[in-house]
Amino acid sequence: MSTLLSEVESIDTLPYVKDTTPTGSDSSSFNKLLAPSIEDVDANPEELRTLRGQGRYFGITDYDSNGAIMEAEPKCNNCSQRGHLKRNCPHVICTYCGFMDDHYSQHCPKAIICTNCNANGHYKSQCPHKWKKVFCTLCNSKRHSRERCPSIWRSYLLKTKDANQGDFDFQTVFCYNCGNAGHFGDDCAERRSSRVPNTDGSAFCGDNLATKFKQHYFNQLKDYKREASQRQHFDNEHEFNLLDYEYNDDAYDLPGSRTYRDKMKWKGKVQSTRNKNSSNNRYESSNNRKKKSPFSAQNYKVTKNKRVQTHPLDFPRSSQNNRTNDYSSQFSYNRDDFPKGPKNKRGRSSSNKSQRNGRY
């Protein structure tokens, strides 16, 4: 009966004992490791029942300050360490090579393969070797070789057997970059959202279409790119961009600061200078109005109903041209009455030739 209750288990942390039951053959070839009984594991059955559940197979025997059994800490599914969850994991693990805290998965050297030299760690645009011409005989592409053709492991059925083989609706094709219909993601005219360069191409390209569909697809693609360029040009002209305007920190100077006082002081000087200039101009204009001009309206008979269109610099030649008869007797001018110009290098005042001749 004791042999039926004994269980044969593999070596574990429990203190296994060897079975010494005699057999008919050589006992050395039938050595078995028997699991200990319940009495050997724990003499307290209540504690054994408590350990079942979370520590059913591997009992947790750590105790806290109150003497209760401590539960196991949560285990992270990212780094397989206890003490935190996956959302709070501080470690970065590459999904390609498995390195921890070294690089991200998109920067793994094993995942980046150059199509020019077939080496790992860099793209075709950063290849240090001389450029060589590549051609794929499967999809007739010039951006990758036959061994790296995406059509090998990316095969899509665009039509069923019952569908018409001569027609193809390009509105069922959607772009993975901009989300619009009518073109593939590799042929999108918008800015690429992914930072991974698309130098090698992918299966989402018009080059992977059948020969009878390529011409019609690229004709529509040309019209789409033309409309996209026009729309982009219109958006650039009518778009309000905050970066086009410089940051003005004058509006954010707090009263009481040094910059604020300096600017207010400078503004006060400028304002006082402007007020002084304006007062001088008003004084000069008032003096000029007080002086009686020979060409003032007092010397003429100006009618309100009839307007005579004359040039302001034209001098009246006769008494019929709104001129009084006694004008010549009241006013007479000679050369000295006219204002003199600025002095020249010899100290003489430069006068106009017309003034020297007495004409005005």
Swiss-Prot record:
<feature type="zinc finger region" description="CCHC-type 1">
    <location>
        <begin position="74"/>
        <end position="91"/>
    </location>
</feature>
<dbReference type="GO" id="GO:0071037">
    <property type="term" value="P:nuclear polyadenylation-dependent snRNA catabolic process"/>
</dbReference>
<keyword id="KW-0677">Repeat</keyword>
<comment type="similarity">
    <text>Belongs to the AIR1 family.</text>
</comment>
<keyword id="KW-0963">Cytoplasm</keyword>
<comment type="subunit">
    <text>Component of the TRAMP complex (also called TRF4 complex) composed of at least HUL4, MTR4, PAP2/TFR4 and either AIR1 or AIR2. Component of the TRAMP5 complex composed of at least AIR1, MTR4 and TRF5. Interacts with HMT1 and NPL3. The interaction with NPL3 requires the presence of HMT1.</text>
</comment>
<protein>
    <recommendedName>
        <fullName>Protein AIR1</fullName>
    </recommendedName>
</protein>
<dbReference type="GO" id="GO:0071031">
    <property type="term" value="P:nuclear mRNA surveillance of mRNA 3'-end processing"/>
</dbReference>
<dbReference type="GO" id="GO:0071036">
    <property type="term" value="P:nuclear polyadenylation-dependent snoRNA catabolic process"/>
</dbReference>
<keyword id="KW-0597">Phosphoprotein</keyword>
<dbReference type="GO" id="GO:0043633">
    <property type="term" value="P:polyadenylation-dependent RNA catabolic process"/>
</dbReference>
<keyword id="KW-0862">Zinc</keyword>
<keyword id="KW-0539">Nucleus</keyword>
<keyword id="KW-0863">Zinc-finger</keyword>
<dbReference type="GO" id="GO:0071035">
    <property type="term" value="P:nuclear polyadenylation-dependent rRNA catabolic process"/>
</dbReference>
<dbReference type="InterPro" id="IPR001878">
    <property type="entry name" value="Znf_CCHC"/>
</dbReference>
<feature type="compositionally biased region" description="Low complexity">
    <location>
        <begin position="274"/>
        <end position="286"/>
    </location>
</feature>
<dbReference type="Pfam" id="PF21759">
    <property type="entry name" value="AIR2-like_ZnK4"/>
</dbReference>
<feature type="zinc finger region" description="CCHC-type 3">
    <location>
        <begin position="134"/>
        <end position="151"/>
    </location>
</feature>
<feature type="modified residue" description="Phosphoserine">
    <location>
        <position position="37"/>
    </location>
</feature>
<feature type="zinc finger region" description="CCHC-type 4">
    <location>
        <begin position="173"/>
        <end position="190"/>
    </location>
</feature>
<keyword id="KW-0479">Metal-binding</keyword>
<dbReference type="GO" id="GO:0003723">
    <property type="term" value="F:RNA binding"/>
</dbReference>
<dbReference type="InterPro" id="IPR051644">
    <property type="entry name" value="TRAMP_AT-DNA-binding"/>
</dbReference>
<dbReference type="GO" id="GO:0008270">
    <property type="term" value="F:zinc ion binding"/>
</dbReference>
<dbReference type="GO" id="GO:0005730">
    <property type="term" value="C:nucleolus"/>
</dbReference>
<dbReference type="GO" id="GO:0005737">
    <property type="term" value="C:cytoplasm"/>
</dbReference>
<dbReference type="GO" id="GO:0000292">
    <property type="term" value="P:RNA fragment catabolic process"/>
</dbReference>
<dbReference type="InterPro" id="IPR036875">
    <property type="entry name" value="Znf_CCHC_sf"/>
</dbReference>
<dbReference type="InterPro" id="IPR049024">
    <property type="entry name" value="AIR2-like_ZnK4"/>
</dbReference>
<feature type="compositionally biased region" description="Low complexity">
    <location>
        <begin position="349"/>
        <end position="360"/>
    </location>
</feature>
<dbReference type="GO" id="GO:0071038">
    <property type="term" value="P:TRAMP-dependent tRNA surveillance pathway"/>
</dbReference>
<dbReference type="InterPro" id="IPR016713">
    <property type="entry name" value="Air1/2_Saccharomycetales"/>
</dbReference>
<feature type="region of interest" description="Disordered">
    <location>
        <begin position="265"/>
        <end position="360"/>
    </location>
</feature>
<comment type="function">
    <text>Component of the TRAMP (TRF4) and TRAMP5 complexes which have a poly(A) RNA polymerase activity and are involved in a post-transcriptional quality control mechanism limiting inappropriate expression of genetic information. Polyadenylation is required for the degradative activity of the exosome on several of its nuclear RNA substrates like cryptic transcripts generated by RNA polymerase II and III, or hypomethylated pre-tRNAi-Met. Both complexes polyadenylate RNA processing and degradation intermediates of snRNAs, snoRNAs and mRNAs that accumulate in strains lacking a functional exosome.</text>
</comment>
<feature type="compositionally biased region" description="Polar residues">
    <location>
        <begin position="317"/>
        <end position="333"/>
    </location>
</feature>
<dbReference type="Pfam" id="PF00098">
    <property type="entry name" value="zf-CCHC"/>
</dbReference>
<feature type="zinc finger region" description="CCHC-type 2">
    <location>
        <begin position="112"/>
        <end position="129"/>
    </location>
</feature>
<dbReference type="GO" id="GO:0031499">
    <property type="term" value="C:TRAMP complex"/>
</dbReference>
<dbReference type="GO" id="GO:0071039">
    <property type="term" value="P:nuclear polyadenylation-dependent CUT catabolic process"/>
</dbReference>
